[in-house]
Every structure is written in structure tokens, then in C-alpha cells.
């Protein structure tokens, strides 16, 4: 564990670093797609982790999506995720985490979504993360543009050394 990591984050220290890998997306209103992803979790010694994510199309490398925000631990076992998307969406997700040996599992869902006037309608988001050693897998569910909450994204990433 980094010596200057805030003690509230000790259980999530294995998240720190840069992760890369491949994922796939689907939704009733779009064609299925594959993507390459890079996620970085970092810290500045305060009780939050900084989070930055970007994806590009697996087929041609064109940029697809990005998110930036903060992961907070308000109390042991609880999580708060604050994110901003360049598509005009902000979200607050609340959830929990559990650590079993070297395995970390996190589950969160939105309690608040903000939309700019030009953003597409998003009504719900939920995320599940699993960190097992140097592998991070996740799934995202989304409710948007008149569709109910359902599977949208899934990826497997590996820690970069």
C-alpha cells in the first residue's frame, strides 16, 4: 500500500494504477460494438481515488467515450462514485464493496443523474466491478432513451506494470 494513501482507502489500494483491456457494448438502440479501454485510479493522499477512463473503437482506434471523477469511501464497506461524461451527463452512484482475500467486489447504482440540455436521456446506471489480482472486470447497466435498465457494457482489463 502506498505510504501516503489515506487510511479510509486502504481496502481499495489494489485499484491504484492503470488498467487496459477490451470490452463490448450493446443496447437496443445501437449496433453492438467492441472497444479498447484504459482506466486509471490515482490518489493525492485525501479520502478519495481519482478515476479517469477512455475508450476507442477496437476496429479503427477512433475515440468513443471518456469519464472522469472520484471514488469515495464514506465509511468502511460503502462507496460513492461521482462522474462526469463529455456527452453532457453527470452521475452520482452509491453502493458497497467487499474484500475477500485478494478479491474486491464493488456494486453501485445511480442516486442522481444530471443532464445538459443537449444530452441524451439517461435515467439509470449501475456498475459492478471485480478486482482479482491484476485483472479488473466490470459490467455497466443503463436505462436510457425510453429503454429500461439493462446490460450495456462489459470488459476485462489488466494492470499495466
Curated annotation (Swiss-Prot):
Name any cofactors this protein relies on: heme b
Metabolic or biological pathway, per its Swiss-Prot or TrEMBL entry: Nitrogen metabolism
**What Pfam families does this protein map onto?**
THAP4_heme-bd
Domain of life per record: Bacteria
EC class:
isomerase
Q: Which Gene3D superfamilies match?
A: 2.40.128.20
Enzyme Commission numbers on file:
5.99.-.-
Q: Where is this motif: GXWXGXG?
A: 17-23
Question: What is the catalytic activity of this protein?
Answer: peroxynitrite = nitrate
Q: Where does heme b bind?
A: 152
PANTHER family registered for this protein in UniProt = PEROXYNITRITE ISOMERASE THAP4, THAP4 PROTEIN
Q: What is known about its subunit structure?
A: Homodimer.
Q: Which family does it belong to?
A: Belongs to the nitrobindin family.
Q: What does this protein do?
A: Heme-binding protein able to scavenge peroxynitrite and to protect free L-tyrosine against peroxynitrite-mediated nitration, by acting as a peroxynitrite isomerase that converts peroxynitrite to nitrate. Therefore, this protein likely plays a role in peroxynitrite sensing and in the detoxification of reactive nitrogen and oxygen species (RNS and ROS, respectively). Is able to bind nitric oxide (NO) in vitro, but may act as a sensor of peroxynitrite levels in vivo.
Q: What protein name is recorded for this chain?
A: Peroxynitrite isomerase 1
Tell me what organism the protein belongs to.
Answer: Mycolicibacterium paratuberculosis (strain ATCC BAA-968 / K-10) (Mycobacterium paratuberculosis)
The root-end lineage is: Bacteria, Bacillati, Actinomycetota, Actinomycetes, Mycobacteriales
Amino acid at each position: 500500500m502506498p505510504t501516503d494513501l489515506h487510511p479510509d482507502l486502504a481496502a481499495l489500494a489494489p485499484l491504484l494504477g492503470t488498467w487496459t483491456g477490451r470490452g463490448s457494448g450493446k443496447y437496443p438502440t445501437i449496433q453492438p460494438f467492441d472497444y479498447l479501454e484504459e482506466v486509471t485510479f490515482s490518489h493525492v493522499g485525501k479520502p478519495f481515488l481519482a478515476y479517469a477512463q477512455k475508450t476507442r473503437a477496437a476496429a479503427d482506434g477512433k475515440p468513443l467515450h471518456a469519464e472522469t471523477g472520484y471514488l469515495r469511501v464514506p465509511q468502511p464497506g460503502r462507496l460513492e462514485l461521482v462522474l462526469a461524461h463529455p456527452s453532457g451527463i453527470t452521475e452520482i452512484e452509491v453502493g458497497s464493496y467487499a474484500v475477500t482475500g485478494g478479491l474486491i467486489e464493488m456494486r453501485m447504482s445511480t442516486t442522481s443523474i444530471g443532464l445538459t440540455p443537449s444530452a441524451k436521456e439517461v435515467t439509470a446506471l449501475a456498475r459492478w466491478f471485480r478486482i482479482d489480482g491484476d485483472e479488473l472486470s466490470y459490467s455497466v447497466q443503463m436505462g436510457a432513451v425510453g429503454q429500461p435498465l439493462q446490460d450495456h457494457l462489459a470488459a476485462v482489463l489488466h494492470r499495466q506494470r
